Amino acid sequence: MTFIDPSKLDLDDNVVAINRITKVVKGGRRLRFAALVIVGDHKGHVGFGTGKAQEVPEAIRKASEAAKKNLITVPMVGTTIPHEALGVYGGGRIMLKPAVEGSGVAAGGAVRAVMELAGVDDVTSKRLGSNTPVNVVRATFEGLKSLKTAEQVAALRGVSAEHLAE
């Protein structure tokens, strides 16, 4: 996995979830906030991060910084993904399927945010199992990491990309 320098990219961010967390201590309850943020450049780079703090803006800032350190490159064929993928993280499973151009992003919630910020315009997805935003995002990223272009598959098999289908 190669490091992607976030300072060279024009990144947009999207807050997917903010959770209120309470810790019960002797004097009462201690309140904190956890944020889940997705960042992407709409050109094949996307990342996610989580942050916790006493105030919401600080949690979002921390999550955004963490997301910029966690960028991945999404291989694309035109406006969609190269092949089907299944991402699994914990109890969450995400099935990603390529779609024809013009069909749009058929995904809900956190998966839609990841796909739009990655620049994938046409994809179909199905969320199976856990629907917790953090598990869904992590499973989506596992699915995106498993994607390979035809050239990468050809190199792994030791044949040229033209002879891959034979």
UniProtKB/Swiss-Prot annotation:
Molecular function terms from GO: rRNA binding; structural constituent of ribosome
Pfam families, A to Z: Ribosomal_S5 (PF00333), Ribosomal_S5_C (PF03719)
Superkingdom of origin organism: Bacteria
UniProtKB keywords: Ribonucleoprotein, Ribosomal protein, RNA-binding, rRNA-binding
Domain S5 DRBM intervals: 11-74
GO biological process: translation
InterPro entries: Ribosomal_Su5_D2-typ_SF, Ribosomal_uS5, Ribosomal_uS5_bac-type, Ribosomal_uS5_C, Ribosomal_uS5_N, Ribosomal_uS5_N_CS, Ribsml_uS5_D2-typ_fold_subgr
UniProt xrefs under SUPFAM superfamilies: dsRNA-binding domain-like, Ribosomal protein S5 domain 2-like
Complexes and interactors: Part of the 30S ribosomal subunit. Contacts proteins S4 and S8.
Family under the similarity heading: Belongs to the universal ribosomal protein uS5 family.
Written domain comment of the UniProt record: The N-terminal domain interacts with the head of the 30S subunit; the C-terminal domain interacts with the body and contacts protein S4. The interaction surface between S4 and S5 is involved in control of translational fidelity.
Protein name: Small ribosomal subunit protein uS5
Phylogenetic classification of the source organism: Bacteria, Bacillati, Bacillota, Bacilli, Lactobacillales
